[in-house]
């Protein structure tokens, strides 16, 4: 997924449909959006918002309702915002000379609000842009969107690991991958530790170099796929946990950054939003990083680790596959890459 809407549209549910009778686009949902104060931040205004300013503005909603794995990522650079009294919607605008001559708003993730406020917040957003679309949303959010005229398709699933009961040491039966990862780190003299602002600053050049090497090793290596796997930030970010792996020569071998997931003002789990390793030298290091982080989170009483979107996986398990063309495209993508 990227800023090319030819790609984005294949992964989103675009509700804009033909209406030969000329009826209002709200006809499909008979409940009009209530009038409420809203704030729209786009363009230069959005670009000028730093992390601290975004946190001050949006964290009251995020800390109460940021329960999804990519909720925290709505604070990242490049997002624009529709903010109401009950919550906010983060989105990006895309444009294409043929497919979207006018900028098209692609809402990123579930709206950040209480479940009961979701319909009205979405209606209010659509009241200002009926061409908007949504991507990487949960099934409860999809259930709200479908009566409004959206088509919805499953694009994958998010693996959720129960932190308190999961065997982070592995075994040679069901969890041999974990055991092998643990053994690899021991043989390689790998040390994994959580780093804070000072440690990140000291290792910034190494972290950036490893990140660039990781991107270069991928099939799509000319840009970051930043919407559902955000760009790494090698500075302090409120609530984000950052674990770094070092080889026996004390060089950076990999890192994993975990975004907090919030419920009712408290962190109940984390999402593995950024994981990058020297895969040529340490093929199982990402697993070892996750297990080390989970042990720390377990001691703190956290509940869940979200490994985030596995694109095109378990498509038939999704409740919604409204567009057969999109479903076929996703299945072909899963098969042929």
Name these PLM-found stretches.
Residues 9-29:
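An acidic, glycine-rich, mixed-charge low-complexity segment common to nucleic-acid enzymes
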Residues 129-133:
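Short active-site oxyanion
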Residues 317-337:
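Acidic, Ser/Thr-rich peripheral helices and adjacent loops at domain boundaries
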